[in-house]
Design a protein with these regions (language model features):
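Short, acidic/polar
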Residues: 77-93, 326-341, 357, 383-386
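Catalytic-core region of carbohydrate-active enzymes that cleave or remodel glycosidic bonds
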Residues: 296-306, 333-430
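Polysaccharide-binding and catalytic clefts of secreted carbohydrate-active enzymes
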Residues: 161-335
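N-terminal carbohydrate-binding accessory modules
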Residues: 35-97
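Aromatic- and carboxylate-lined catalytic core of secreted/periplasmic carbohydrate-active enzymes
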Residues: 387-508
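C-terminal beta-sandwich/jelly-roll accessory domains of carbohydrate-active enzymes
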Residues: 469-478, 490-563
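Aromatic-lined substrate-binding rim segments of carbohydrate-active enzymes
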Residues: 83-157, 290-304
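The substrate-binding groove and active-site-proximal loops of carbohydrate-active enzymes
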Residues: 70-79, 102-120, 168-188, 274-291, ...
Length: 563
């Protein structure tokens, strides 16, 4: 029977006639539903897509907001059922709901025009058995700049499939984005993949997003010096990019605006005429052509099966020059070039092996770019950053790399944080983007965050500031993180670890703010269940709300005001 959330008795009591119609409607729907098999029912769902709510974008899966509690597999793990067999249970114990997994061009199309989907069909079935969703990573023309995952028939035919050249004329194992045959072959394989996903998974929706290529960028020079590239570099900057810059002149990111301004905001000319003669111009040139190439792939894929599709970037280091990092990739200082050249790309994502987390997230949310973190170092900061990114930035999700390397999954901090987010998911989904959710990220260098939520100012400090825990005396502090959700004027939920909160009234500063009630609990079937009522020493006699560093928990608290 199809279940309904309506309270039929209450509805009938309120209005007898409407109640009868409601009952008849529900009965008819139920009878009709019984005649549908499960696959037909699933066809009623929209395919996974992005939807705006307030200031954030939400990923909608099976018609509901879905936060990716993910983990990315190591590059070679998804190549056989046998290797994956012991990994699936570990992923479940980690409280993942999504696995980011590569699809390898070399395995998909070992001979030109002959595609083998058997491996991926079997792996999709294994994901279904474990109640896990998949984000496929298309290791096509480029993976970490290189073309190592291109099929052998592409690699050995260098005349047909040209490679990049550096400024000394040396070739590298990187397919040139200026080679038409490179694009045609990559695009054809991608189309075949999307067609098969639609046919095999179009009703189940196990595959919910696609990352197209992986960490695109030019190495070891800032631009490609292949004759095809040199010819394009001498041509005038395309009108398409110029029009984008003119239209968005006041809002393009300052890093790009400054490059354009140095030559007087010219609106026609070669790349060097407009942006100057330097490696930064070389990078802008590559960004344009990489984005156009990738957009062609994504546009073709979406025409077949329009899942959300994105690209990811290897972050550059401070003061490093293009070419010392993958030049022209989807990086924040050239994100407008990617937005102009890649309108079909849903968002640009950072891969984090860089400790300055807040800095890079702040850069990536510009230009209304949704934040998703497909890779993060599998380190002890990952749990805190996961909950912070979802709380503060409204991130679509979080995914540490080489997730299968976890040795003790059930006791892993990330597993505990994912469990908390999973329980809070209905609240997060309801209040995201509406100014009711915040996140905190705390360590010894940043031991305090001050938040304004409704009528209150919340001062959130690392629990080590209390001095109660032995590790508070350490030279460095373990990173703490949490999400805070305001569900009513005086009601809040906080989930995470390692914090202490005090309060002020923003509207009437002369009033004191008291803690009316604090409960520790959990959500079971989306219903709040109290485990402990906290008071006395656990709230410092009503002075604060706290959870110690290793106390991964959810607290519900109410505030009140007094003279």
């Amino acid at each position: 029977m199809i279940k309904t959330d309506f309270d039929i008795a209450r509805l009938c009591k309120k209005n007898h006639f409407i109640g009868i119609l409601a009952v008849l409607s529900i009965i008819c729907s139920s009878l009709y539903g019984q005649n549908l098999n499960s696959k037909q029912e699933q066809k009623l769902h929209q395919i996974p897509h992005l939807k705006k709510q307030g200031t954030v974008s939400q990923l909608i899966v099976d018609d509901k907001p879905f936060i990716i509690l993910g983990g990315e597999l190591g590059n070679s793990s998804f190549t056989s059922l046998e290797y994956m067999h012991p990994i699936w249970p570990k992923l479940k114990k980690m409280n993942l709901n999504t696995v980011l997994a590569p699809v390898y061009w070399e395995l998909l199309e070992p001979e030109e025009g002959k595609f083998d989907f058997d491996l991926y069909d079997q792996l999709i079935n294994e994901a279904r058995k474990n109640n896990l969703k998949l984000v496929f990573l298309w290791f096509g023309a480029w993976k970490n700049s290189m073309s190592s995952h291109a099929p052998a028939w592409v690699k050995i035919d260098q005349k047909r499939f040209p490679r990049v050249k550096d400024n000394k004329g040396k070739s590298h194992e990187i397919l040139s984005p200026f080679g038409e045959e490179n694009l045609k072959a990559d695009l054809k394989a991608y189309e075949a993949l999307m067609k098969h996903i639609k046919e095999f998974d179009g009703t189940e929706n196990t595959v919910i997003m696609i990352q197209t290529e992986n960490e695109i960028g030019m190495l070891p020079t800032a631009r490609d010096y292949h004759p095809l590239a040199n010819k394009k570099f001498q041509e005038n900057v395309t009108v398409e990019l110029i029009n984008y810059l003119k239209k968005n002149k006041k809002v393009i990111v300052p890093e790009l605006s400054e490059r354009w301004a140095k030559n007087g905001f010219k609106e026609s000319g070669t790349w060097e005429d407009i942006f100057g003669k330097n490696v930064h111009t070389d990078e802008i040139f590559m960004a344009w052509h990489y984005s156009k190439y990738t957009n062609s792939i994504i546009e073709a894929g979406k025409a077949i099966y329009a899942l959300p599709m994105f690209v990811n970037a290897a972050l550059n280091r401070t003061d490093s020059l293009p070419g010392s990092y993958p030049s022209g990739g989807p990086l924040p200082h050239i994100m407008d070039v990617w937005k102009a050249g890649g309108p079909s790309i849903d968002f640009l994502s950072p891969d984090f092996y860089n400790p300055n987390f807040k800095h890079w997230c702040d850069l990536y949310i510009r230009q209304q770019n949704p934040l998703f973190i497909p890779e993060h170092s599998l380190d002890k900061t990952a749990a805190a950053k996961a909950v912070y990114s979802i709380g503060h930035y409204g991130a679509l999700g979080f995914s540490p790399f080489s997730i299968e390397d976890i040795n003790d999954p059930e006791n892993e901090p990330l597993a505990k944080i994912y469990n908390i987010i999973k329980q809070l998911n209905p609240l997060i989904s309801a209040y995201q983007g509406l100014g009711k959710i915040e996140g905190v990220l705390l360590d010894k260098e940043t031991p305090m965050n001050v938040l304004k939520m409704g009528n209150y100012e919340l001062t959130v400090k690392h629990s080590y500031t209390l001095g109660y825990e032995k590790d508070s005396k350490n030279e460095t502090w373990d990173m703490a993180g949490a999400i805070i959700i305001q569900t009513a004027e005086n009601e809040f939920y906080v989930g995470g670890s390692g914090l202490v909160i005090t309060f002020k009234n923003l509207i009437k500063p002369d009033l004191n703010v008291g803690i009316l009630k604090v409960d520790e609990g959990k959500f079971e079937s989306n219903k709040w269940k109290v485990i402990r009522h906290l008071n006395g020493d656990q709230t410092h006699q009503g002075r604060h709300v706290r959870m110690m560093y290793n106390d991964y928990s959810i607290l519900r608290f109410e505030l009140y005001n007094y003279d």
